[in-house]
């Protein structure tokens, strides 16, 4: 079962093992994304910011910093997977193909497991395998992610302001 959503969020009860969610948004990676992420993380590998150096490698141009791609693929899935939850961790992060400036990244996630939380009766633990891919379908990242998700009856509902 595959579905594309508008990002309304899911409560624990909405996750079904085997469900594949195609996240609706894509994002084109810019040079600014790569430079900013590389600088803020103090990543001194010139493959990310030195075009002259990168031109001499097998890639021929700067590679996009992989932690940015991890954040991007995670971010593309938030509205569907963890809007009503918190991350417990990432596992088995893999980067089978490079990402370059100008690539557009899309994502999908498959629900691997869903169980009641042992320590929080008002929540459940969901594990997904997320896949990031380029505009041509090339897979650029995969990872497993565990999320603690609210059950519907316990979902925090902040009051909306009165706009009268």
Task: Enumerate the language-model features and the residues they cover.
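Short histidine-centered beta-strand/loop micro-motifs
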Residues: 61-62, 85, 97-98, 118-121
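Mid-chain, well-packed structural core segment of small domains
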Residues: 83-88, 93, 97-101, 107
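HotDog/MaoC-like acyl-thioester-processing domains
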Residues: 1-17, 100-104, 108-164
């Amino acid at each position: 079962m595959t579905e594309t959503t508008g990002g309304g969020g899911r409560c624990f009860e909405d996750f079904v093992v085997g469900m594949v969610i195609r996240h609706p948004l894509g994002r084109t990676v810019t040079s600014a994304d790569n430079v900013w992420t590389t600088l803020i993380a103090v990543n001194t590998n010139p493959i990310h910011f030195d075009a002259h150096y990168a031109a001499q490698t097998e890639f021929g141009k700067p590679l996009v910093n992989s932690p940015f791609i991890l954040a991007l693929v995670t971010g593309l899935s938030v509205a569907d997977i963890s809007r009503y939850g918190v991350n417990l961790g990432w596992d088995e992060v893999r980067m089978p193909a490079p990402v370059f400036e100008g690539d557009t990244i899309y994502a999908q996630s498959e629900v691997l497991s869903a169980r009641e939380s042992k320590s929080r009766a008002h929540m459940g633990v969901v594990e997904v395998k997320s896949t990031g891919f380029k505009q041509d379908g090339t897979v650029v990242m995969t990872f497993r992610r565990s999320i603690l998700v609210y059950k519907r009856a316990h979902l925090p509902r902040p009051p909306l302001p009165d706009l009268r």
